[in-house]
Amino acid sequence: RDYWMKGKIAATKDGKITGLWCHVTADHGAFDACADPTKFPAGFFHICTGSYDIPVAYVGVDGVYTNKAPGGVAYRCSFRVTEAAYFIERMIEILAIELGMDAAELRRLNFIRADQFPYQSALGWEYDSGDYHIAWDKALKAVDYAGLRAEQADRVAAFKRGETRKLLGIGLTHFTEIVGAGPVKNCDILGMGMFDSCEIDRKSVV
């Protein structure tokens, strides 16, 4: 979608995030095809802190009308969470570069801990459950993250020696999103919503 996003992120020198600021200029196109005044509150406003324990956050969105096609028509996604996830993950990557930290470790340092659930984000969204640290460690182990970083360093060294022109990029992301129309309490104007939460037991019964 045609989004212009500006952000600021505050953190301590050791990488602990202390605050997040975001402003979005969102192109609606010639008219709002969604006819949904809760679209932004249900999506971008509340989920852009991602999977991270950020104590203070602010988000502002300006919706503008232009001579383009209606916003969101050509691109299917659930309630703008794609842009929200892209925003916070880019901020994390930039912070890692600024602090000289490994991007995976920076994420792990700031994940919401399992003992913090149910968790309410700085923007008022309630996360019912999760264990991000275990999921993250399993994912890194599955792809041999340490091995990939070692290979990346070797290629950089070989590039500097003029032995290769091929470098290795490593992309990381960890996101939390809402699904469906979102919790009822956040869709009061629209007058609709879906299940606020559910549990699955070991027999896979919802």
Where are each of the predicted segments found?
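Flexible, glycine/threonine-enriched loop-and-boundary segments that flank and lead into catalytic domains
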Residues: Q152-E163, L167-L190, F195
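Glycine-rich loop/linker segments at domain edges
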Residues: D2-M91, T176-M194
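Short glycine/serine/threonine-biased micro-segments
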Residues: D27, E98, L167-G169
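Conserved small/polar residues in nucleotide/adenosyl-binding loops
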Residues: V205
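Charged, low-complexity, helix-prone segments enriched in Lys/Glu/Asp/Gln
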Residues: F44, G63, Y145-E163
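Extended lipid/amphipathic-ligand handling interfaces
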Residues: G7-I9, E199-R202
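Beta-strand segments within the central parallel beta-sheet cores of soluble alpha/beta enzyme folds
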Residues: R1, T18-H23, I54, A104-I112, ...
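N-terminal leader/propeptide and maturation segments of large enzyme subunits in energy/redox metabolism
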Residues: V73-E151
